């Protein structure tokens, strides 16, 4: 609210799960998200260009007899052992059928939205999830799961995939979808498909230095989307070299500078990381680079990350990111808008609600 106005184009070049562009669309801005990781792109696209509830439920009803017919046609010996360990044969056959039917869709937005819904139920701890009980935030190591299933004689659940998919859709639509549609891309952040000076505000969090687990942490979701996590890992930027990281950040900042309008701001969320036994403040490393590119460094904000809020919560302080560092940059002169926000009662300003009856969990 302080850095953009209604109608502005708000860009996140590393959109991850799409939170920033979604919030932009929910608040009468045009959210644009980009991420080279396929799973991140699918989730971003689903949030800012969602299908309608009617189309989703209509497709599920259409798919029911087709899933029943196709489920028996799959030879599960063709499926990787690492995948099979998570699912009963009954459930896995349905997953394969649903995936194939989604791939055959010509409607890109509906197809993508259904993929995102499936990613949301592919694994997790509750009865809506299709796998054995596991974590939802990341795909667990198949080696660990194999040992756990064997040692504890775990029974793989039989799920009705389309029923779980429908329940997931009802929960997603319960709070409404953004009235403003955004745009999603899956390209290198150093070469965005945007015109010069076309963006009003940039907010993003580049890949943290020395954190290289994204593809592996989503290996099972990537499998569903038809990707190998090893192939995705090769495409994503990753390095243990601080010099290469600086070169990457410089190229990204150049691209942000190119697409950002004059007298506008860019907020870059970085972190403090441990390197060779010492704490490195990435803001101190990146700020001079931003100035070299042409930005003004308006301010640096420090914010501790509670362990419970970390994406990679299983890392200790020596491995992960202990503190977020927010770098506020301006291209030309920019003063944040004087807007007071009641965060306790704040609500989206542009939202569409479709009446549905949400089934109990």
Regions found by a protein language model. Name each.
Residues 287, 294-351:
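Class I S-adenosyl-L-methionine
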Residues 198-201, 207-263:
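SAM-dependent methyltransferase catalytic-core segment centered on the flexible catalytic loop
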């Amino acid at each position: 609210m302080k850095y953009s106005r209604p109608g502005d184009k708000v860009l996140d070049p590393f959109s991850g799960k799409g939170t920033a562009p979604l919030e932009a669309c929910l608040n009468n801005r045009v959210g644009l998200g980009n991420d080279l990781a396929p799973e991140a792109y699918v989730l971003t696209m689903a949030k800012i260009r969602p299908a309608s509830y009617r189309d989703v439920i209509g497709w599920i009803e259409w798919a029911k007899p087709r899933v029943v017919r196709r489920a028996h046609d799959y030879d599960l010996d063709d499926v990787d052992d690492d995948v099979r360990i998570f699912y009963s044969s009954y459930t896995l056959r349905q997953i394969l059928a649903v995936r194939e039917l989604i791939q055959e869709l010509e409607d890109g937005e509906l197809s993508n939205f259904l993929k995102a819904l499936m990613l949301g139920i592919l694994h997790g701890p509750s009865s809506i999830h299709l796998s054995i009980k596991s974590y939802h935030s990341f795909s667990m190591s198949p080696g660990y799961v194999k040992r756990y299933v064997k040692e504890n004689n775990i029974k793989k659940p039989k799920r009705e995939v389309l029923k779980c998919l429908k329940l997931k859709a009802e929960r997603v639509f319960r709070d409404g979808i953004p009235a403003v549609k955004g745009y999603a891309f899956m390209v290198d952040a150093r070469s965005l498909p945007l015109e010069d000076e076309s963006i009003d505000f940039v907010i993003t969090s580049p890949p943290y230095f020395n954190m290289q687990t994204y593809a592996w942490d989503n290996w099972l979701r990537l499998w569903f989307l038809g990707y190998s996590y090893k192939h995705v890992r090769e495409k994503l930027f990753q390095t243990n070299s601080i010099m290469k990281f600086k070169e990457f950040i410089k190229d990204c900042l150049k691209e942000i500078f190119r697409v950002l309008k004059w007298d506008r701001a860019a907020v870059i969320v970085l972190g403090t990381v441990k390197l060779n036994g010492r704490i490195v403040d990435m803001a101190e490393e990146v700020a001079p680079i931003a100035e070299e590119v042409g930005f003004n460094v308006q301010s640096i904000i420090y914010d501790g990350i509670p362990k419970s809020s970390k994406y990679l919560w299983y890392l200790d302080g020596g491995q992960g990111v202990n503190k977020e560092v927010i770098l506020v940059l301006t291209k030309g002169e920019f003063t944040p808008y004087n807007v007071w926000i009641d965060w306790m009662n704040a609500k989206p300003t542009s939202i569409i609600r479709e009446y549905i009856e949400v089934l109990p969990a």
